[in-house]
Amino acid sequence: MKGYIVQIEDATLKNENYRQVLFTAKHCQLVIMNVQAGDQIGEEIHDLDQFIRVEAGEGVIMMDGQKHAVSDGFAAVIPAGTRHNVINTSSDGLKLYSLYSPPEHKVGTVHKTKKDADTDEHHHFDGTTSVA
């Protein structure tokens, strides 16, 4: 099979890793995340589009200086070139999934913690996909 099927809500809610790449195609990538209580992704700007859907927890998504409160069921589309950050304001993990278009991370990337992600200089997409 060339595609990927997953019960995304279950996968996202069960995820205990800060970041885990589930599937990478040529033009998009599916990633699940668990941002710990009081933590944040960190302000960033991508040269790609990003979709985020929150499955659990409460937080704030900052886009170009505007603050947006989010919780279970909220989604955000972040166009390429938009300064953004995701901040967990709840006492539990902020669990979300993200679609990057095109891919952002290498196939198989798993970061147990944000510190692991911040110190991994080799996690950016290298052109390899999950599709053989």
Residue locations for each model-derived region?
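Short acidic-glycine-tyrosine-enriched beta hairpin
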Residues: 66-80
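Glycine- and acidic-residue-biased ligand/ion/polar-headgroup-sensing regions
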Residues: 49-59, 64
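A generic "binding-loop/recognition-motif" signal
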Residues: 26-28, 37, 47, 66, ...
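A short, N-terminal "cap"/entry segment at the start of jelly-roll beta-barrel domains
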Residues: 1-27, 111-132
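Conserved short histidine dyad/triad with adjacent acidic residue
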Residues: 15-16, 31-46
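Ligand-binding loop in jelly-roll beta-barrel domains
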Residues: 80-106
